[in-house]
Amino acid sequence: METECRIHTLVADVALFAEGQVLLVRYRDMAKNDNESGWFLPDDELAYLEHPERAGTRILKEQLGLTGLKPRLDHIESFKGNSGAWHMSFHNKLDLERMPRLKTSNALAEARWFERRKLPVRDEVAHHGWALHVLEMMTKGQT
């Protein structure tokens, strides 16, 4: 059975908040991320038939070495991507009391905590500041 779809792209990300800060990452292999070098929320494509919240848990484990955490779906975006494929992005959110110790995977070039009021400028964020837009939507409580 074919499990790769070229018509749709399903992506999950996680906005991880702790101590008034949010975690952003840069990926080592830009080719896997639309040749974007800027900051992202930790993200990945959904595995075949994977639930978006389970994808959030997997992303935290695989990319950041965090286990036992269960991010919750905050909102969904639907749009046509640069490739022409229909993109659905599932934005998960998790608030922690304390910053966890990260064990970053080799896929990440960098993981950095940013104060919520001192986020990087839009030009430094991948996809024209998309992570900033997602965080803004979460802050406004728009779902």
Language-model region placement:
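Conserved Nudix-box catalytic region and its N-terminal flanking loop in Nudix hydrolases
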Residues: 21-62
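Flexible, glycine-rich phosphate/dinucleotide-binding loops
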Residues: 23, 31-32, 80-82, 120
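Short connector loops at helix/strand junctions that flank enzyme active sites
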Residues: 9-11, 17, 36, 41, ...
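Active-site-adjacent beta-strand/loop module that shapes the phosphate/pyrophosphate-binding cleft
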Residues: 18-20, 77-101, 134-137
